[in-house]
């Protein structure tokens, strides 16, 4: 049985001790990192949240403490009282390496079994083991460093928002299901039989209502939930830095958030973000990078070579252009000698993005090598090379298809080649860009209807409103995403604040007036009472912390994450519940038949 503290108080954290503390009598508490018995001396590395301190116990210092210290094992939780002295053999690799503690008294607060994972930095352990014993995984110094970064970052954000006169307000977790996009997590109501709450995918509607309520500037570090198929770096529950402002336009939101980004990255990463941050329209991003979240740390831009081959007899190019598509290319530098097998692999890669194939032209020392050269005139080949600014040693990769396929496949290929050529290896740059003027709507061919690109409350650009019903695909949105190194960090928009325009939007999305009012009556009703123009933005806090902590795994920045199957190996949630609980809810559970 562990000893109790009996009024003993810790006086300093292990990792905070430095040379200027030598001579002080201290009380430290923590976990045994390791123990070494060197005959007449026992050395214990004691670890707490702030770091590791070497403690030495000896018969000459205190015999009882020495004998007791010899009993401790890895991960025992102990307290030690004693005097700090200069270390005889300093360790310059440790912040506390010039000092050690002479242990005069020790208490074993609790014992530990042999841990199933090592408590050390850079642990190479299976993810399911780490998640199963997450409380041990979180003891590791590199994990604790991440959560200090998370804490400090949210504090900087809160302080900044407070200085900018924002109010931190909480919005409901149990709310109404308004499905449009990802699936809601549903919570059955015991009091209202057959009815359900939904967990919020974002605080979107409530923050708009707060603007109608006259709160002017709102923010929240908000928990959000989406019941969607998990891709890499997605979690069913995640955290947003959410904000909304009244009487503002797009530029106001962008300007404020640029200053916030600048502050966070200066204080947390020591990086000076130059303002204003570059802006790029969605159309330009797609045409140049094949993505609405372009990674601008490297070039390899997409080039439209349709004009260069517009009179070509090569059937693949000709039919793509005739059918309203295009022929576009990227240039892989110094890759002309890429093995044919690798090029064929890249051809298979673009097919996963619905491209029919990949044409290529290698600019070798001894001339041009290409399976399509025989189909192209000499001047067409020259025009292609000129358009992509090709030089000897380069490899030109070409896709011909409808524009959406060309953009998607070449955008993905651009990133794949950058990975293959290790273009971004050891690149520590933070490259921001705002993407603006998104399409307001996109056509869902399966459902045969238009759907909102962001959400149905986004304001169309003023000059495009007239096309809302007649040509919905043409309408651009007052929407903006902040992108960092090819990842969407956050997104926002100016909101519709007019009932009539909001009803028009719902109609284009396929809602009847009745169904729109049934789902969103509380918002539409509120818009009858003088709503202000308003706009906002939300960041993915987890993704922001990933950048600041230098990890590519979202599970590293969430204390208790789910695995790739939305399952918690630690608590085994989701799990079965008592039959009584289910009966109270008026729910009948049927087994899903295996497909």
From Swiss-Prot:
GO terms for molecular function: aspartate-tRNA ligase activity; ATP binding; catalytic activity, acting on a protein; nucleic acid binding; transferase activity. PROSITE patterns: AA_TRNA_LIGASE_II. ATP binds at residues 226-228, 235, 488, 540-543. It is found in: Cytoplasm. L-aspartate binds at residues 180, 226, 454, 495. Coiled coil: none annotated. Pfam families: GAD, tRNA-synt_2, tRNA_anti-codon. Belongs to the class-II aminoacyl-tRNA synthetase family. Type 1 subfamily. Homodimer. This is Aspartate--tRNA ligase. It comes from Clostridium acetobutylicum (strain ATCC 824 / DSM 792 / JCM 1419 / IAM 19013 / LMG 5710 / NBRC 13948 / NRRL B-527 / VKM B-1787 / 2291 / W).
